[in-house]
């Protein structure tokens, strides 16, 4: 990880007096969970702490009635981050650091929410497969256009599905079944959370919500 909690915390201590209250609280909370994540050796727990850190920065309720990647507020947040990312941290994350892990994640039905709706009898097999094909097509379009915010929204919707499996008891702790997904998601989220916090700190006068 290029930038860690200590680096960001030291900077925050120097700058926080100049942060608007809303930004200051988001950064403070996100850093506290990033710190906890970096201390955690267990991958499942580290993953959960990293998601909390990201959610602390986002600081907006996620409506489970609609797919995360389709939520207007969430997409606007990612687009704002991309527009303010003058050193291309998000682009580097998606296109240089983890392109293979991201492609594997996008092709994995077990981190696609409609698959689990099918398992619970809420969707038919044809419905979930149609949704999965449509989602892969959307992801491929984002890949072809190198549309970083759109691709991140789709990737994070998959990561959110994995988060839900763990938090709601739908997966076994330390399960061999999801080790690859957990490992990749921990790596991606570790880089993403630090990038998001840094971009927000770079733009204290931006309205963050």
Cite the ranges covered by each PLM segment.
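Helix-loop junctions and short alpha-helical segments
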Residues: 2-22, 50-142
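Polyanionic, low-complexity intrinsically disordered segments
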Residues: 3-13, 17, 21, 118-209
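Short, solvent-exposed positions on alpha-helices
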Residues: 44-48, 176
């Amino acid at each position: 990880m290029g930038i860690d909690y200590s680096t960001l915390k030291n900077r925050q201590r120097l700058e926080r007096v100049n942060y608007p209250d809303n930004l200051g609280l988001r950064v403070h909370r996100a850093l506290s969970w990033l710190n906890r994540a970096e201390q955690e050796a267990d991958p499942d727990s580290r993953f959960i702490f990293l998601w909390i850190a990201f959610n602390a920065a986002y600081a907006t309720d996620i409506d489970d009635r609609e797919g995360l990647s389709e939520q207007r507020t969430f997409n606007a947040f990612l687009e704002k981050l991309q527009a303010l990312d003058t050193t291309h941290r998000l682009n580097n994350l998606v296109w240089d650091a983890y392109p293979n892990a991201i492609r594997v994640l996008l092709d994995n039905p077990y981190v696609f929410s409609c698959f689990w709706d099918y398992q619970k009898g809420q969707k038919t097999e044809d419905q979930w497969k149609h949704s999965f094909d449509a989602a892969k097509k959307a992801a491929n379009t984002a890949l072809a256009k190198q549309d970083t915010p759109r691709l991140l929204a789709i990737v994070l919707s998959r990561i959110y599905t994995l988060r839900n499996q763990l938090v709601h008891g739908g997966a076994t702790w330390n399960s061999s079944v999801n080790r690859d997904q957990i490992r990749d998601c921990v790596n991606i989220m570790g880089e993403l959370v630090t990038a998001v916090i840094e971009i927000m700190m770079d733009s204290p006068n931006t309205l963050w919500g």
